[in-house]
Amino acid sequence: MKTRKNIYFKVVALAAIAIAFAMPAKAQLSDNGYANIDWQFNAPLSNNFADKASGWGMNFEGGYFVTPNIGLGLFLNYHSNHEYVGRETFQMGAGEVTTDQQHTIFQLPFGAAARYQWNRGGAFQPYVSAKLGAEYAKIRSNFSMLEARENSWGFYASPEVGINVFPWVYGPGLHFALYYSYGTNKADVLHYSVDGLSNFGCRLGLSF
């Protein structure tokens, strides 16, 4: 697990540095474009399979302001939530199994985003946004040397409120956001059923 965490944070750091050097050396993009890359913290709401909050996620978004305040763009993010289930006996096929389990839900939504942003060009730029698209989810249980899983597709919707802060004349700014998301994904794994994936979380990253 420690090695996995180290790899994750190295990937995040390298991605952030790469984007920072690829962007123009201004506090914001020189035209009407915008972009942000974020670390993501996620707390699942009532999915009864893997409902432990985690910081195993990232968010990517970019777009273009079609008016002075309205921006349209694309997004993609991913997240993994995990939960350990203690030793129990349950039915599997024609027999019974007694074991502990490691549950995981991996979510990968992507699609279109729209935002309304205030004070463009200023140091503090609050906004509200909505994301709509599709969500791929992998719901799995690992136990003993076995794995039970189901892949699911669903519709995804997510309102968001956030702020971009540009404290420097040059370089990228800071991005902070709170969001709620809901996916219509459904799955049946072993004796568990998942009917919809809802989450509340926050994002912290770089804004361009």
Where are these regions (language model features)?
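Gram-negative (and chloroplast) outer-membrane scaffold detector with strong preference
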Residues: 32, 41, 61-143, 154, ...
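Outer-membrane beta-barrel translocator domains and adjoining extracellular loop/strand segments
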Residues: 47-54, 84-91, 138-147, 186-193
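Short glycine/proline- and aromatic-enriched beta-strand/turn motifs that initiate or cap beta-hairpins
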Residues: 25-66, 71-72, 207
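Cleavable N-terminal export/targeting peptides
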Residues: 1-31
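Membrane-embedded beta-strands of outer-membrane beta-barrel proteins
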Residues: 37, 58-60, 112-114, 128, ...
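Residues that define the transmembrane beta-barrel architecture of outer-membrane proteins
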Residues: 31-33, 52-56, 104-110, 124, ...
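A general secondary-structure boundary signal
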Residues: 2, 67-71, 79, 107, ...
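Predominantly the C-terminal beta-signal and adjacent terminal strand-loop region
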Residues: 80-87, 162-208
